[in-house]
Amino acid sequence: MILPRLLFPVLVTAGGILTALVPTFARSAETLSSPVETTAPRDTAAYRREVRKAFAALRADSLSQAQRALEAALGHDPDAAGNDVLRFNIAKILMARRQWHDAEGRLRDLLAHRPDYGEAQIALAQCLSEAGKDSELAQWVDTLLADHRERTTDEVHTLLFLQSEACRRLHQDERALTALHRVLKTDRYNARAHSLIALQLYIEGHRDEALLHLGTALLRHPDDETALAVGAELAEREGDKVTALERLEHLLRLRPDDRPLQVHRATLLLDLGRRNEARRQLDSLRAAAGDELAEQLLPLYHRLR
């Protein structure tokens, strides 16, 4: 099954962290390092210097160096006005390094004294998802969406997709579908929601309804990756490997370096008897990946004999 890998990629990158830090630097130096009433020692010059170091490190993709600089900045001025932004970005760095437990702890600490920090709320949901804490995630999303805080449509959709995936893993299929239908209430042609509904309905045996949802997704958004992935999946389940291959190749044009998709393409080519194309795909994969994919490729090479 090719679908799950496409749905919930890690949403945190160094570039994303860099973008989030820009508002911090856009503030005046006075605002960035202005303290609240405190007796804690301050070194404003060192604070600014470490924040600039963090900014430069992120531009160079050095997450560990950026984290050290941000931690040092917090030590130089513990009560500066911009510190919550720095703490949030430390959590994002930990997420980018896939240190989910540590990131979750930082986000919970931040939310303990800034419970209205919207970006941190969503980042915590992403953390819980990546850590496999599905029950906590589903409840956290319910809590966030019940607080009537003003959120962007994208934020709400992010939370609902995370909840839907968590509920699917918990085998709470109706709850998963409910989350997806909530997406459609604000975006009636959302390709991802229609596609995931289609997959769930098909698995439950509601073939015709599933194909209607898939058709809506592919018609309205022919280049949507989730729609193409589900489309390939359902075509293969229907026994239509030609259509499955067409959709998979369309998806590969959008994700040309996706090796697991390339392996699946080689498998479909072999199933369809297109041995020369399959061999070229396998040889290309072996040349690019070396021994990394040897175990996966060996059975496919055996089929060429």
List the predicted regions and their residue ranges.
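N-terminal leader/linker segments that initiate helical-solenoid repeat arrays
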Residues: T19-N89, A96
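Helix-start (N-cap) detector for alpha-helical repeat units in TPR-like alpha-solenoids
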Residues: Y47, A81-D84, G118-E119, T152-H157, ...
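Structural signature of tandem alpha-helical TPR/SEL1-like repeats
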Residues: S62-R68, R97-R106, G132-T143, L170-R182, ...
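Structural marker of alpha-solenoid helical repeat scaffolds
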Residues: H76-D79, H113, D147-R151, T186, ...
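Canonical tetratricopeptide repeat
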Residues: V85-N89, A123, T158, L162, ...
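Terminal, low-structured helical/coil segments at or just beyond the last alpha-helical repeat
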Residues: D271, N276-R305
